Amino acid sequence: MNLTHTQLAEHGYMSGFANEFATEALPGALPVGQNSPQRAPYGLYAEQLSGTAFTAPRAHNRRSWLYRIRPGAVHKPFTLVEQSRFLSRFDEVPPSPNQMRWSPPAMPTTPTDFIDGIVTMAGNGGPDAMTGCGIHLYLANQSMQDRFFYNADGEMLIVPQQGRVRFVTEMGRLDVEPQEIVVIPRGVRFRVELPDGEARGYICENYGALFKLPDLGVIGSNGLANPRDFMTPVAAYEDREGDFELVAKFQGNLWRADIGHSPLDVVAWHGNFAPYKYDLRRFNTIGSISFDHPDPSIFLVLQSPSDTPGVDTIDFVIFGPRWLAMENSFRPPWFHRNIASEFMGLITGVYDAKADGFAPGGASLHNCMSGHGPDADTFAKATSADTSTPHHITDTMAFMFETPGVIRPTPYAARSASLQQDYYTCWQGLKKHFNPNVR
């Protein structure tokens, strides 16, 4: 949505990344000068939602205080849900060094909501060790009805590819369209509505440290994803009673509990642990204006840091519209073998390193040290292109989840009918040009 900040405020958003926000849906619902008064305004309950340890350094501490109609503990006991699609187990299929690519999956033919429509493609690590990630697709054709969800295993970075999605969370509402992303923190309860009837996209489930903006180094004080373009919702609440279901993801399994009211009953909240969205089209792309294609780290939107400086548990990178001005240079992303592992998706358009076969809604996986790069057609065009004039790449948006750990496919991904068995052939047309007598 190309809205001004005034319009975004009118639509119910607050600007900034990890700011200390304060918002109330009823006047005076936030206590003044304290977090947990003896009696909260309007007969509300005070509840703290902690996203980091109590003693985490202040610059990294994430928590919010919620003022709600009923505490989060009010529900019946959870029971295990038997299912085999939304997982955190990545040891059932030996990971392969082969390059892998999947065509876009078809939409479901039976009524399927957001949670039932999630299928796990790959991942590494796990929620018990609080490191690594799960990579999933979602395919849905029905809004969640009388059903709510939260993820205790990690925060969810959601990348819509087809269809608008409305995330109605306990901390407010976010309307998201393709080429925007949304991040739902660990533990935040929500339901998903589908304004367009169908929706498809990607999810990165982050088991590790919270996503943050990367340091800019010599880029300076501005660039890449600017903090003011991240939008957090204002408080909005539901006061509904009925026969509802609360679904939780906990240690790789889904659990369900009966709940007699909507858990989206937060009337006011303050803090810096909250859902947010970001429009990828606002990314300030940095590139070379002399020669050579820089490393893809210049396209970094969000990172989940590890304990090793310079190494992230997850990098979220995008490849959007941009100008290529490098002279006498191979302009597409170069051939590469990487210590890290790369899972890519395409939101819209054509990816500049692949002329065919990588369609919007599809995905690819290039694991540690697996060779990859432009296909034969792209190489042929790029090596004969006129580089004396700039080239404008338009109408495209691809992304990458990059991790230092090997990304291990699930049985679903390894045996999927959408797996392109002939993917390797896109490089077989790369011919020998070597001649020791001609430089």
From Swiss-Prot:
Domain of life according to the entry: Bacteria
| Catalytic residue positions | 293 (proton acceptor)
- In this chain, homogentisate is annotated as bound at 351, 372
Q: In which pathway does it act?
A: Amino-acid degradation; L-phenylalanine degradation; acetoacetate and fumarate from L-phenylalanine: step 4/6
Q: Which residues bind Fe cation?
A: 336, 342, 372
Q: List the disulfide bonds.
A: none
Q: Which Pfam families does this chain map to?
A: HgmA_C, HgmA_N
Q: Which cofactor does it need?
A: Fe cation
Q: Which UniProt keywords apply?
A: Dioxygenase, Iron, Metal-binding, Oxidoreductase, Phenylalanine catabolism, Tyrosine catabolism
How is this protein organized at the quaternary level?
Hexamer; dimer of trimers.
Q: Which PANTHER family match?
A: HOMOGENTISATE 1,2-DIOXYGENASE
Protein name stated in the entry: Homogentisate 1,2-dioxygenase
